[in-house]
Structure formats: structure tokens, C-alpha cells
């Protein structure tokens, strides 16, 4: 029988091959043998998220956070799942918790920027993208979304005078 670390490795490989349902069975087996295995919890959550099962993924991240409340991967992945469910404020809370622990976490900054953009706070979103780009100049997610946010901001300011004239 394989050891728990090789089961984790197998599950990861299955995910790489797109065999997510089978990977979930492996993660469950790891967690049956080692109920506090945070890596298995988080990877199971990521796999569930990939399958579109965001609420179940959030439960996995919450389980990991119950054991290790400052786990950056669990916080950012939970934020990502909440974002996908349209719970932008809750997602922002997760990213802010991660940033309190690791202020120069480019991914958390970029994801926070995405969530801020979703609720219309484009200037704040751009600040987050800029901060992420200061840490990682080639971070495509931050660069691409900064460009989109700037364009939206520009178009939004062009529309305002026209709307005021009609009123």
C-alpha cells in the first residue's frame, strides 16, 4: 500500500491528467488516514473548485483554516471560490487576511483587485494591480486587468458628462 505522501502525489498527478473525480477519492483516502492533512484539504478544495463545486471547496478551505488559521493558500483559494459565487466582499476579506500575514503577496493583491473591480471600485482595483506589479513586474493577471480597469475608468468618465447633459 502506498504511503500518505505518495497518495498525495498520485492525486496531484491525476489532477494534472484531468482525472479530478478519481483525484478526489485519493484526497479522501489521505484525509481518512490523516484527518488533519492541510495539503490534502486545500488540494481537494482546488479540485472541487475546478469541477465547479465552489461551496464544497470553501468547506475544505474552512477545514484547513480551522487547523491553521493563517494558511495563505487556504485564504486565497477560499477568496477565489467566494469571488466565483459573487460574494465579492467576503472574497476581499479573505485576501485582506492573507495580505496582513504576507503584505507582498502579488496573487492576493491581484485577486483583491479583481474583486474590487467587480463591485465598481476601479481606482482601488488599479492600486491593487499596481502593488502586485511592483512585486512581480510580469504578473499577467495584474497587468491585463489593470489595462481593463483603466479602460473602464476612462470610458466611465467619458459617459458621465453626457449623462449629466441629458438630465
Describe each model-derived feature in a short phrase.
Residues 3-33, 39, 46-50:
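Alpha-helical segment of the N-proximal tetratricopeptide repeat
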Residues 3-5, 38-39, 72-73, 106-107, ...:
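Helix-start (N-cap) detector for alpha-helical repeat units in TPR-like alpha-solenoids
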Residues 15, 42, 49, 76, ...:
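Position-specific recognition of the canonical hydrophobic site in helix A of tetratricopeptide repeat
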Residues 29-32, 62-66, 96-100, 133-134:
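Conserved structural position within tetratricopeptide repeats
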Amino acid at each position: 500500500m502506498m504511503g500518505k505522501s505518495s497518495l498525495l502525489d498520485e492525486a496531484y498527478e491525476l489532477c494534472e491528467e484531468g482525472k479530478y473525480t478519481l483525484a478526489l477519492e485519493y484526497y479522501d483516502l489521505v484525509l481518512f488516514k490523516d484527518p488533519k492533512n492541510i495539503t490534502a484539504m486545500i488540494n481537494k478544495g482546488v479540485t472541487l473548485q475546478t469541477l465547479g463545486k465552489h461551496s464544497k471547496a470553501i468547506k475544505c478551505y474552512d477545514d484547513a483554516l480551522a487547523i491553521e488559521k493563517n494558511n495563505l493558500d487556504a485564504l486565497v483559494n477560499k477568496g477565489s471560490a467566494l469571488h466565483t459565487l459573487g460574494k465579492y466582499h467576503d472574497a476581499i476579506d479573505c485576501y485582506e487576511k492573507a495580505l496582513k500575514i504576507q503584505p507582498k503577496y502579488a496573487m492576493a493583491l491581484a485577486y483583491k483587485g479583481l474583486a474590487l473591480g467587480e463591485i465598481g471600485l476601479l481606482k482601488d482595483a488599479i492600486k491593487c494591480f499596481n502593488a502586485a506589479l511592483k512585486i512581480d513586474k510580469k504578473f499577467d493577471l495584474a497587468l491585463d486587468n489593470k489595462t481593463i480597469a483603466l479602460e473602464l475608468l476612462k470610458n466611465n468618465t467619458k459617459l458621465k458628462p453626457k449623462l449629466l447633459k441629458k438630465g
